[in-house]
């Protein structure tokens, strides 16, 4: 079985931000070993060595559903996968209308299903809920904007509509966002669970994504 992970910076494997004062440049620390689909791969290889699965990372930092539609043919369909895990939203909720996001999601689900690809829609993590002291100075304004969006519960609306479209096309749903919200409701400081204190989950929280995907991926591989 071949599975493509189609998403943004979280899927690519982006974590902390580092600031170089001399050049005035912010770098993203990438860690392909700690990304959720590699954690998933290692667990399946350990617990189900009989399964033959090829894993493809098609995550690109900064991508939205607009970008996804531009590269879906090359990065997903041309790979001829059996399964596609798609996780977009972090770069949509902050700068795109709900109607456009829903329309784009519908096109993505529809295109993948037309090509006979099994789809798992994984909802993203939360944004920060306040401006953390670790946020780089040149990202403080962004942190304030994202906190406002999260505290208005705007992502709830976007991902709820996306789940409806996923169900319409018979896609499985791994609802990571719901788990993050539950953690927040239980008093967990979810901003501390973000490696860049903005929108990139910590390495430990990538394990949550892997755990949510595990059963469905194994089920599909055993078919």
Segments predicted by a language model, with ranges:
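Serine-esterase "nucleophile elbow" of acetyl-processing enzymes
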Residues: 1-58, 71-80
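Histidine-bearing beta->alpha loop at or near hydrolase active sites
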Residues: 62
């Amino acid at each position: 079985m071949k599975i493509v992970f189609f998403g943004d910076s979280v899927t690519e494997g982006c974590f902390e931000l580092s600031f170089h004062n001399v050049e005035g440049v912010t770098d993203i620390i990438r860690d392909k070993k700690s990304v959720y689909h590699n954690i998933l791969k290692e667990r399946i290889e350990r617990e189900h060595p009989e399964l033959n699965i090829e894993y493809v990372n098609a995550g690109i930092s900064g991508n939205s559903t607009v970008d996804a539609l531009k590269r879906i043919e090359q990065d997903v369909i041309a790979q001829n996968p059996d399964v596609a895990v798609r996780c977009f939203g972090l770069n949509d909720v902050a700068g795109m209308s709900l109607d456009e996001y829903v329309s784009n999601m519908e096109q993505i689900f529809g295109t993948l299903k037309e090509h006979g690809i099994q789809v798992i829609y994984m909802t993203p993590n939360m944004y920060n809920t306040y401006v953390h002291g670790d946020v780089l100075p040149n990202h403080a304004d962004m942190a304030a904007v994202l906190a406002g969006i999260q505290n208005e519960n705007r992502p709830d609306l976007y991902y709820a509509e996306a789940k409806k479209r996923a169900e319409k096309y018979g896609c499985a749903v791994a609802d990571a966002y719901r788990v993050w919200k539950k953690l927040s409701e239980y008093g967990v400081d979810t901003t501390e669970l973000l490696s860049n204190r903005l929108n990139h989950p910590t390495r430990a929280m990538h394990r949550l994504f892997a755990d949510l995907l595990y059963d469905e991926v194994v089920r599909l591989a055993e078919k």
